[in-house]
């Protein structure tokens, strides 16, 4: 088991929290992480690229000249691919780039990046974020108290609406719920900030 410091939102230490070594203490597998990132980024592609083939280009319904007797090559349409202004052959069409890797690989990739955050001392565990009124200024102050001044991924429990409202206008903070935690967001953040309740939910899901 690995231990990390548990902080209050004012930055003071509130003891230690024990992490599940099977989730936060494994040897990171970079190959599996790479596969997970490529899969996520592929799923994010819009895939709306399209060109017009000869049937979609406007015009070209009439045969440009008769089949025989002109001495020229036979042509059936001025929208054939060899003509200027003609259709495109084998061009890109709308498609989905999404694919999936095995569930065990996805879980291993997630455990790997979580373990890497612990190794990098970039995991910040907070007992709770609690605000009487959801003000961005107050949340920014809390992050400052926790020495979180760069890009941060904030993992909050589902029912913490005041913290979500207070943090959503911060440009360097992305908020996810425990079930939405993913490899790409963790890798794109400098610090992973998670509440104690959300940490328990993540460990329960990955156990």
Swiss-Prot record:
Keywords: Ribonucleoprotein, Ribosomal protein, RNA-binding, rRNA-binding. Part of the 50S ribosomal subunit. GO terms for cellular component: ribonucleoprotein complex; ribosome. This is Large ribosomal subunit protein uL4. One of the primary rRNA binding proteins, this protein initially binds near the 5'-end of the 23S rRNA. It is important during the early stages of 50S assembly. It makes multiple contacts with different domains of the 23S rRNA in the assembled 50S subunit and ribosome. Forms part of the polypeptide exit tunnel. SUPFAM superfamilies: Ribosomal protein L4. One of its GO terms (biological process) is translation. It comes from the Bacteria. Residues 45-78 are annotated as: Disordered. It holds the Pfam family Ribosomal_L4. The gene is rplD. Belongs to the universal ribosomal protein uL4 family. GO terms for molecular function: rRNA binding; structural constituent of ribosome. Residues 60-71 have a biased composition (Basic residues).
């Amino acid at each position: 088991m690995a231990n990390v410091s548990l902080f209050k939102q004012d930055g003071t230490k509130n003891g230690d929290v024990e992490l599940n070594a099977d989730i936060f203490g494994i040897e990171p597998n970079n190959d599996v992480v790479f596969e997970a990132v490529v899969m996520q980024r592929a799923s994010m592609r819009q895939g709306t690229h399209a060109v017009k083939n000869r049937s979609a280009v406007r015009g070209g319904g009439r045969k440009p000249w008769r089949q025989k007797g002109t001495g020229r090559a036979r042509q059936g349409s001025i929208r054939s691919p060899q003509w200027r202004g003609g259709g495109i052959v084998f061009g890109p069409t709308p498609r989905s780039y999404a694919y999936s890797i095995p569930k065990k690989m996805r879980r291993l990739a997630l455990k790997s990046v979580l373990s890497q955050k612990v190794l990098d001392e970039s995991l910040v565990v907070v007992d709770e974020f609690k605000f009487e009124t959801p003000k961005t200024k107050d949340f920014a102050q809390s992050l400052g108290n926790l020495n979180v001044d760069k890009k941060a991924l904030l993992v909050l429990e589902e029912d913490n609406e005041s913290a979500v409202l207070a943090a959503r206008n911060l440009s360097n903070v992305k908020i996810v719920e425990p079930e939405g935690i993913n490899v790409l967001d963790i890798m794109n953040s400098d610090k992973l900030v998670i509440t104690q309740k959300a940490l328990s939910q993540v460990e329960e899901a990955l156990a």
